[in-house]
Amino acid sequence: MEKVCVLGAGSWGSALAMVLAENGHDTLVWTHRAEQAEEINRMHTNKKYLPETVLPTNLHATSDIAKAATHAETIVVAVPTKAIREVCEKLTAELTKKVLFVHVSKGIEPDSLKRISEILAESLPAEKVDEIVVLSGPSHAEEVVLHHPTTVTAACADIDAAEKVQDLFMNQFFRVYTNDDVIGVEIGGALKNVIALAAGITDGLNYGDNAKAALITRGLAEITRLGVKMGGNPFTFSGLTGMGDLIVTCTSVHSRNWRAGNMLGQGMKLQEVLDQMGMVVEGVRTTKAAYQLAEKYGVAMPISTELYSVLFNDVEPKVAVDALMMRMKKREIDEMKH
């Protein structure tokens, strides 16, 4: 039995905490909202994020980050990308021993263009970090809590650390593979949210299955181009954390990014969409980072670029789609390389 703390009591943090508790681990969830911690402890529910779910009675919560830090041998970071530095700052003062960190956030920090593992390595004291492992893949929280079969990947340059995380989470409903390609896994997990926003827009415009199939395929091509240029393994992008996560995020009603894109395609403005969603839509922030990364690495990312225009330059979605369709003629395989 491992002592594990999950930082973040949103839908994904709560679902993973449920997996860990059901696997017999001593699991504590940290939330910055005291009333949410009390609800989890007293009612064994998290109505805002998982309204139909009863949480295990051996899963506990706290709003005291000092208690969270001292409890854990392994810490799972399940907070939005924009909150990671702030949470790490609070956590750093309370860490008393070396800890294995697992992050499950999918994003890239705009401007700094750092991946999550880089932000963690920069924000946490090195002497208190055992290893940093990323856990990613096609995994909607709403299905995990129903024990629907789910398969993900644990990635770390230190494969022993990845295998430890594999052992922590794996059970008959939740299968975990390992990978040593942290860059590829993180880039695939982050950028699929960008393509999912675009997929939602095509559905909002009622453009049908042909358009969405093309968008997913061409989206994978540009994710792969960038990921390989940044040092990722090209084979990673055809795996669970690339194509797998892209499919589920572009096609499922559980996907926040798809839902947000769908509203944009129906004519809503970005701020209206974000206000109505009431939850973090990582793809919006990541689109800005993707646009910056494309410029930095000199990689063609036409879908991400047009989406950036829709989100931040008030270009109409239909105009952006027309621009993609009328790009210069290309050979498909050559275009996937460059």
UniProtKB/Swiss-Prot annotation:
Coiled coil ranges: none
Residues reported in the UniProt entry to bind NADPH: 11-12, 32-33, 106, 141, 256, 280, 282
UniProt keyword terms in alphabetical order: Cytoplasm, Lipid biosynthesis, Lipid metabolism, NAD, NADP, Nucleotide-binding, Oxidoreductase, Phospholipid biosynthesis, Phospholipid metabolism
EC main group: oxidoreductase
Subcellular location: Cytoplasm
GO terms under biological process: carbohydrate metabolic process; glycerol-3-phosphate biosynthetic process; glycerol-3-phosphate catabolic process; glycerophospholipid metabolic process; phospholipid biosynthetic process
Major location (coarse): cytoplasm
Name of the featured protein: Glycerol-3-phosphate dehydrogenase [NAD(P)+]
Pathway(s) the chain acts in: Membrane lipid metabolism; glycerophospholipid metabolism
Catalytic residue positions: 192
Record-listed sn-glycerol 3-phosphate binding positions: 106, 137, 139, 192, 245, 255-257
Family: Belongs to the NAD-dependent glycerol-3-phosphate dehydrogenase family.
Enzyme Commission numbers on file: 1.1.1.94
Catalytic reaction equation(s): sn-glycerol 3-phosphate + NAD(+) = dihydroxyacetone phosphate + NADH + H(+); sn-glycerol 3-phosphate + NADP(+) = dihydroxyacetone phosphate + NADPH + H(+)
SUPFAM superfamilies: 6-phosphogluconate dehydrogenase C-terminal domain-like, NAD(P)-binding Rossmann-fold domains
Natural source organism: Lysinibacillus sphaericus (strain C3-41)
GO molecular function, one term: glycerol-3-phosphate dehydrogenase [NAD(P)+] activity
Function: Catalyzes the reduction of the glycolytic intermediate dihydroxyacetone phosphate (DHAP) to sn-glycerol 3-phosphate (G3P), the key precursor for phospholipid synthesis.
GO cellular component annotations of the record: cytosol
